[in-house]
Regions:
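Conserved beta-loop-beta/alpha segment of the NTase-like Rossmann-fold superfamily
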Residues: 97-99, 107-112, 117-171
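N-terminal glycine-rich phosphate-binding loop and ensuing alpha1 helix
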Residues: 3-4, 8-112
């Protein structure tokens, strides 16, 4: 598989035709979300919290605004385009990303008892449960290219590439 089989969303680069890269056909591709960097430009914030978990204000499904981690907004946007197979490349100190995408039924039950169950969290968990999520470990921060190559070793065929620290606003 050569570079022509990789669609890079974060830079809107595509080696495929415009029709193949349209949102209507994205469901055919798995998505590789790179989150292995150490976030030196965001220190001291990124020392303890992964930059991909930075809170942003994003539209929810009902067009209301909601505070959510950047990587969640990216996941939901790809999910909305039909993607159901996700590969996350994570590095040291990125356990918060894996935890965030691991549904916690006990936490939802706790919130229900307090009558504070946010529908958006239930919606996120439903999306996660209807998707395939795989976490790949980048043992040392060797850059974006290394993260893409790690994905290439396990993903068969063409795949989408999205950096977890770059958000593209959809229409």
């Amino acid at each position: 598989m050569g570079v022509e089989n990789i669609i890079i969303l974060s830079n809107r680069i595509s080696k495929r035709s415009a029709d193949e890269a349209s949102p209507a056909s994205l469901e055919a591709y798995p998505a590789l979300i790179t989150a292995g960097g150490i976030g030196t430009r965001l220190l001291p914030f990124s020392k303890e919290i992964p930059k991909e978990m930075l809170p942003i204000i994003a539209h929810d499904g009902d067009d209301s605004l909601q505070l959510k981690p950047l990587v969640q907004a990216i996941f939901e946007q790809l999910y909305g385009a039909g993607v159901r197979n996700f590969y996350f490349v994570v590095g040291r100190g990125k356990r918060a990303i894996e935890d965030h995408f691991s549904p916690d039924s006990g936490f939802l039950e706790f919130l229900e008892k307090k009558a504070k169950r946010p529908a958006s969290l239930s919606d996120l968990y439903a999306k996660i449960r209807s998707s395939n999520l795989v976490f790949l470990n980048q043992t040392e921060p060797l850059g974006f290219g290394d993260a893409v190559l790690r994905g290439r070793t396990v993903i068969k065929g063409p795949f989408l590439v999205q950096a977890a620290d770059t958000f593209i606003l959809s229409k």
